[in-house]
Each structure stands twice: as C-alpha cells, then as structure tokens.
Amino acid sequence: MADNPVLEQLLRRLEVADGGLDSAELATQLGVEHQAVVGAVKSLQALGEVIEAELRSTKCWELTTEGEEIAREGSHEARVFRSIPLEGLVQSELMQLPSGKVGFSKAMSNKWIRVDKSAADGPRVFRVVDSIEDEVQRRLQQVQAGQAEKLAEKERNELRKRKLLTEVILKTYWVSKGKGFSTSVSKQEAELSPEMISSGSWRDRPFKPYNFSARGVLPDSGHLHPLLKVRSQFRQIFLEMGFTEMPTDNFIESSFWNFDALFQPQQHPARDQHDTFFLRDPAEALQLPMDYVQRVKRTHSQGGYGSQGYKYTWKLEEARKNLLRTHTTAASARALYRLAQKKPFTPAKYFSIDRVFRNETLDATHLAEFHQIEGVIADHGLTLGHLMGVLREFFTKLGITQLRFKPAYNPYTEPSMEVFSYHQGLKKWVEVGNSGVFRPEMLLPMGLPENVSVIAWGLSLERPTMIKYGINNIRELVGHKVNLQMVYDSPVCRLDIEPRSSKTQEAA
C-alpha cells in the first residue's frame, strides 16, 4: 500500500513501539488530520489480524468560534475598558461599539468602570482602575495550549456559560500489533472484475472477505408526507366502519351547492369575499338542477316543510357564482341529492377526504388551503345521541380520547356541536371538528323522506396530524417552510385504538 504514506508510517512506528500507539498522538507527530490516521487504522483492520484497535473515548475541551476570537483579541470587557480614554466616554457611544453591550455589563461587574449620570452631555463612563488583567483571555489561551484540565471547574463552567468553551468527546484508537502483523501488506481486492476472470489474475490476488452483517446502501425512494400517512389511516377507519367514499373532484363549486343547497342564506357573512375565494373566469355555473333549484329558492324565500324560511328575495345569479369550495359539505349535498333520487330510500354512510379553501388569516393553526374530512350517515330516526355515539367511536379509533363537545350554530345543522381535543404541544384545547344533524329545510327539498335524518361531522386533516406528530405550527407541516428531513423521518402513522373511557368525554 505504497499509495498511503500515513498507513506506512503507522506500521513503521508500531513496529518499534512499546505496547502500542494512540491515534491522536500519532496524528500530532505526523502533522496530519486525526481522521487520516483513523482511515489508515480502518484499512488495516479490513486486512484481518494485522493490527488490533481499541476504540477509546476521552472528554476534552474546545473553544467555540467566539472563544477563539477572544483568545486572539481579548475579552469583550477588556476591549471596552481599553476603548475608554482618561476623560471618559459617553455611554451611548460606548454601547455602539462591537463589544459594547456585553463588555459594559461584564466590566461593571468587575468594577473596572463606573458611570457618571450627572455629566453634562449625558451618562459618561470612566475607568476605575489604571490597568487590568484579562483573565478570560488567559484561560482561553490555556485551553488552546491543551491545559484545560488545569482550570478550576468553576472557571470552566463560567466559560461554558458564556458559550466560549464547549466539552467534546474525542474518539481515538489504541493500536497494537495483531497476530498477523507485518510492515509489508498488500491491498485486498473488494470486487471480482471480468478482466480478472479472463486473465486468470484472480488466482494470485488476495480478496477481502465478505461481511454479511454489513448494512447495504439504502436505495433512494419517495417518502409519504405525514398528511398522506394520516389520510390513509382515516380512510381505512371509515371503510372499517362501513362508509362509502364520495366523489370530491369539484374543487371549483357553484355557490348553489356550496351554500344555497345547505340552507345558508345569500346574505350570510361566510359568503363574503373576506371568507371565500370567488372565481373571475369562469364566473358562473351554467348547469344546475332547476327543479331542485326552485324548491331551494322557495324554502329560502317563503319557507315550507314546517319552516318559515329566511323571508328574503333569493337570486339565481348569486347562486350561480363560482368559487373555490369552502367545505366538502358541498360534496355531501350532491351525494344526498343523488341518494334522494333513488326509490325506495336506502340508508347510506358516506365519507370524503379532500382539499377546501378559506380566505382567512394565516397563523399557527390556520391555513388558506387545507384538507377536510367529512362523514355523513342517512337513516330513519337518527338523533343527536346517535351522532355522539358515532363521534365517540370514530375519535376512539383515532386514538384521540381527550374530547370536549361544545354547542354551536351552523345554518344547515340543528342541533350542532363543535369537537375539541387537547393538544399536548400547544398546551390548550383546539377545535378538531364540527358536527350536527342536517336541517329538514336542507333535506326535504332534495326529495328525502320526512322520517329520514342525516347526521354529519367534519374535521381538518392537518390538526390531528399535528397532534399525532407533535407539530406545534401548521406552517411546519404544509408550505415552503417544511423541513424535508421531517418528511423522510416521520414514522408510519398508527392511530392506536384505545378503550373507551367516559372520563375523557366532557361536555364543554
């Protein structure tokens, strides 16, 4: 191995050494990086029993970047002291110096300087002593000289507190002769090439033994985002509970399906531009089920089905406005309308997981674009009790047991409830879902029988993902600030099924 001078020097010195060599000391003697000696040691280890190498760990002290600067130019407090002339210096000017803020407080603590607040031009700083000894610089230089152990523990701790000194673990090898030691070693071949086979040279060459315990190089592959991992678990839970997935391919939705079909009045604040993204082109939906539209119009403006309605002039042009859907309940309305056209009525359970869009302020728990999970059950005689039972079962399957229910208002559900879960990272209760029983004013115009009730709930995909993976800021989960290493390292999502506990279900 004539092409490796460090390895040759190691063998020569080991031949005459008494007992063995320390890799760090050898690196210093040879004037090379320690890693070069370590590489030579590992190369010799791969040859068999040429050497024996024992890995040793030693605590040592190193200067930080700031510590090296101070060892070279002096401490901040010493620099402040030297910058003050005999006639003193205005404090405001002193604070503008590179070492002013840190050095001033330390110099005051050392009683090297004083402040005269009665000076005519403002507080002025004067020297108290004629000369100083920069002990901080001296101690750091002592560490540089390899004499850190001579410092008192209190002195080292003070330097560490000021982030001038850091403790590191130095890993070295104690190298000694092996059973097959020789100063003349040859390189072992790692691969059998076609040329060796054709020429027959493989017969005379030493080959490196296979290491069947070594871990191979992992192939490059794609990584699922935590949202997709949690989404697959939610989808599996819905399928286990007997739900059918709804089509949700309408990112662009008409105001009719997004609002009017849900018995949400056209003057509702949620329909304002401050909450909704309206489209400029195409601005209007051209095709709507006009028979159903007329029934919805009559329910809004005149009432019916036991309701007084909203008593306002309902406008078709308002219902035609296109927007980015604000919730997947629009997809639920379409699914329920299709269900109502099938005779006779058959109970159904639907779910969807897809993107929705809200024109709202971004913060640690809100995005303008996020995923909504929605579950819908249509059957005869469903009540709020059925809804709470399903929610309890659903969230238990998610492994979320710290729940609170809070009465709420939705234009299209009555009664309505918000669902809260305790977020361990944020140390507060966060809303994870909304739920309720769809109003007759929404269901009956679709053509559903009068004795059919529909219970539904929705929640975002992002917040349960944050709870599962311990993420405190939603912008660390979605957006340009996402750390791709987090995506690579996130484990497979397993939403543990935990036993029910009435203590975890609290009414807010």
From Swiss-Prot:
The keyword Ligase applies. It catalyses: tRNA(Phe) + L-phenylalanine + ATP = L-phenylalanyl-tRNA(Phe) + AMP + diphosphate + H(+). Keywords: Acetylation, Aminoacyl-tRNA synthetase, ATP-binding, Cytoplasm, Ligase, Magnesium, Metal-binding, Nucleotide-binding, Phosphoprotein, Protein biosynthesis. This is Phenylalanine--tRNA ligase alpha subunit. The keyword Amino-acid biosynthesis does not apply. InterPro entries: aa-tRNA-synth_II, aa-tRNA-synth_II/BPL/LPL, Phe-tRNA-synth_IIc_asu, Phenylalanyl-tRNA_Synthase, PheRS_DBD1, PheRS_DBD2, PheRS_DBD3, WH_DNA-bd_sf. The modification N-acetylalanine is found at residue 2. NCBIfam families: pheS, PRK04172.1. One of its GO terms (cellular component) is phenylalanine-tRNA ligase complex. L-phenylalanine binds at residues 329, 372-374, 412, 438. It comes from Rattus norvegicus. The modification N6-acetyllysine is found at residue 311.
